[in-house]
Amino acid sequence: NFFYYNKTKQISPLEFVHQTTPPENYKSPINRFTLIANWTIRCIDITKQAYDYPETMIIIEDYSFGSKGKIFELAENCGIMKYMLEVENYKYQKIAPTTLKKYATSSGRSNKDDMYDKFFEETQLKLKETFSKKKIKISSPVSDLVDSYYLCKYLVFPPE
């Protein structure tokens, strides 16, 4: 999920990223993570050129230690991404999920619904209706888009 800080000082989604798709044909999970990392680097490169930014700032949500599910695959994916960023000389910073939640909602214990409500209050974008019409609970990709919005906002407008 890609957002950028535009010249009118607003956080905007990158439209061209939505016109490209990450790779779907892969041989193994590690191959998939490598293809996704390469696609991400390509998107960052295109953004840097398209918007003529002298410096690219990247922020990544760090691991959540209470995560359930495919935590090892997530770690492998993130490790490959960080490695590729370093190979391409892109600097990045990490932010803890609780720090991001506190920044967005004033509470580090907020849930996905709280994050979405705050996002909607700020942007008036109805992501839930667009991406998960049948679902009542907030889930991917809606929660991922909300998180990426607040990651960008945190980078551009850090807390004092």
Predicted regions and their residues:
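Phosphate- and other anionic-substrate recognition elements at nucleic-acid/protein interfaces
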Residues: 1-160
